Swiss-Prot record:
Modified residues annotated as Phosphoserine in this record: 391
Name of the protein this chain belongs to: Zinc finger protein 322
Gene: ZNF322
PROSITE patterns: ZINC_FINGER_C2H2_1, ZINC_FINGER_C2H2_2
Places the protein is found: Cytoplasm; Nucleus
Species of origin: Macaca fascicularis
GO cellular component: centrosome; cytosol; nucleoplasm
């Protein structure tokens, strides 16, 4: 396989052999493998029959056929056909956007991206989706959009056979196999596989929250979180369960809910092989293997503080509310309700649910509240075998469906 430079050298040698065109009496230079020059001006690629006025343009065309990409990025080792493409690409790493819109001051890495954007100001939206009527400034954007209706995913990963509707999504996915993370934060040097991940991360340093709700003035760093929040106001629940037709505002809530029907428990404890429907439940469970509560009278240990309390009541034969502070730092002698009230007054609400913005003192309370949204009933009554969300009257009778 010849490089474009070698082909160019061969063309120069061939020109000394073929001198005159028999039809027009003008000079004609022919390279039998790649190129024909007619009238000293037209260069034709014999692979695709495309004509060019300049030899350099022909070389660029040849590289699309040979796959040759001689220009390499020093930051991520990506290669390009033209030096101009490399220069445009390097602006991503340098966060440089030299092409500014005079109408709204938006900036872009490439002049073509600016041209496409400017059509939105001129009202020129030439490409309309026949299915939903949405307009686009470029035909390529319409083509990608239509795949959301057809379900077409033409970009296939050769490693795991996963398909994607966009080539950029495939490129990003491949990095999960290679471990490549070309986008680096200049503040903390943390690296990311996708540019959007880097942009979102940088907002943790700048404090920027560009997505603002016009209903309640809440703001968000991530567009996805903002979209989910807006559904609180609109009541929209686009994710529907195929088994019971219950609807949800978040896809993650639907996935968790569907495990009620399928019985799937993908989160497994490697210590005892117990399985759970939620990752949060697994994390909470794993703490039982690492934290123990010791009895001061006997050398017996418990995984839960509540088990220790019950044990102490049995062997001490004392009223439970007369105990002093135990070794683990809990006020066991206090009435539980009074203790919870004190926590409410003194502690901040650390656990917040993004769907309805309710906050809780404990992660367990947040997990129980989430079942209101997901419809999940992870506990079963030993007497009636009825599924429960762990309501107080049944709490003592309930055993977790692990």
């Amino acid at each position: 396989m010849y490089t474009s430079e070698e082909r160019c050298n061969q063309r120069t040698q061939k020109r000394k052999i073929y001198n005159v065109c028999p039809q027009k009496g003008k000079k004609i230079f022919i390279h039998v493998h790649a190129i024909t020059q007619i009238d000293g001006h037209i260069y034709q690629c014999l692979e695709c029959k495309q004509n060019f006025c300049e030899n350099l343009a022909l070389i660029m065309c040849e590289r699309t056929h040979t796959g040759e990409k001689p220009y390499k990025c020093d930051m991520c080792e990506k290669t390009f056909v033209q030096s101009s493409d490399l220069i445009s690409h390097q602006r991503i790493h340098n966060y440089e956007k030299p092409y500014k819109c005079s109408k709204c001051e938006k900036s872009f890495w490439h002049h073509l991206a600016l041209s496409g954007h400017q059509r939105t100001h001129a009202g020129k939206k030439f490409y309309t989706c026949d299915i939903c009527g949405k307009n686009f400034g470029q035909s390529s954007d319409l083509l990608v959009h239509q795949r959301s209706h057809t379900g077409e995913k033409p970009y296939l990963c050769s490693e795991c056979d996963k398909c994607f509707s966009r080539s950029t999504n495939l490129i990003r996915h491949r990095r999960t196999h290679t471990g490549e993370k070309p986008f680096k934060c200049l503040e903390c040097e943390k690296a990311f596989s996708g540019k959007s991940d880097l942009i979102s991360h940088q907002r943790t340093h700048t404090g920027e929250r560009p997505y603002k709700c016009n209903k309640c003035e809440k703001s968000y760093r991530h567009r996805s979180a903002f979209i989910v929040h807006k559904r609180v106001h609109t009541g929209e629940k686009p994710y529907k369960c195929g088994a019971c037709e219950k609807c949800f505002g978040q896809k993650s809530d639907l996935i968790v809910h569907q495990r009620v029907h399928t019985g799937e428990k993908p989160y497994k404890c490697l210590e005892c092989m117990r399985s759970f429907t939620r990752s949060a439940n697994l994390i909470r469970h794993q703490a039982t293997h690492t934290h123990t509560f010791k009895c001061l009278e006997y050398e017996k240990s418990f995984n839960c503080s509540s088990d220790l309390i019950v044990h102490q009541r049995i062997h001490m034969e004392e009223k439970p509310h007369q105990w002093s502070t135990c070794e683990s730092g809990f006020l066991l002698g206090m009435d539980f309700v009074a203790q919870q009230k004190m926590r409410t007054q003194t502690e901040e609400l650390h656990y917040k649910y993004t769907v309805c913005d309710k906050s809780f003192h404990q992660s367990s309370a947040l997990l129980q509240h989430q079942t209101v949204h997901t419809g999940e009933k992870p506990f079963i009554c030993n007497v009636s075998e009825k599924g429960l969300e762990l309501s107080p009257p049944h709490a003592s009778e309930a055993s977790q469906m692990s």
